[in-house]
Every structure is written in C-alpha cells, then in structure tokens.
C-alpha cells in the first residue's frame, strides 16, 4: 500500500517535474534574454541601414544640389551683373 503510493507519487512528481522544468528552462529565461538582445540588434541594424540610406540620399542630393546650385549661381551671377549695370 505505501509502496504503491510512493511509486505513484514519484511518477506524478516526475510527470509534473519535467513539463514544468523544461519550459521554465527553455522558454522563460533564455528566450526573453535572446529576444531582447535580438530586438536590440535589430534596432541597431535598422538604424545603421537608415544611416547608410541617408548617406546615399545625401550623396544623391549633394550631386543634384550641386548641379542645381551651379545653375543658381549662374542665374545669380547674371542677375547680379544686371543689378551692377543698373
């Protein structure tokens, strides 16, 4: 009678121990840590991508703006010459 109860209790303990222990080990602690780290990494990588995109945009803008600014300079020089004649 006592042996059967002990065996059943041990079986119950094993049954309850393993499912409770495994998720707490696998799910609760490492996943939260890894997810936060991966989120941080993703944020950094995204910001880096944005920075590189901005840099490429700046290059494109600077090249286009240099063309437009040279046009503006030509216009302004001609207009300033006109004002000088005035």
Swiss-Prot record:
<protein>
    <recommendedName>
        <fullName>Uncharacterized ORF3 protein</fullName>
    </recommendedName>
</protein>
<feature type="compositionally biased region" description="Polar residues">
    <location>
        <begin position="1"/>
        <end position="13"/>
    </location>
</feature>
<feature type="region of interest" description="Disordered">
    <location>
        <begin position="1"/>
        <end position="86"/>
    </location>
</feature>
<feature type="compositionally biased region" description="Basic residues">
    <location>
        <begin position="37"/>
        <end position="60"/>
    </location>
</feature>
């Amino acid at each position: 009678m006592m042996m059967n109860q002990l065996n059943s209790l041990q079986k119950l303990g094993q049954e309850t121990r393993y499912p409770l222990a495994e998720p707490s080990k696998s799910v609760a602690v490492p996943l939260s840590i890894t997810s936060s780290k991966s989120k941080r990494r993703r944020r950094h990588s995204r910001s880096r991508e944005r920075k590189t995109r901005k840099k490429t945009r700046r290059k494109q803008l600077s090249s286009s703006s240099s063309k437009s600014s040279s046009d503006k300079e030509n216009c302004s020089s001609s207009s300033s010459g006109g004002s000088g004649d005035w």
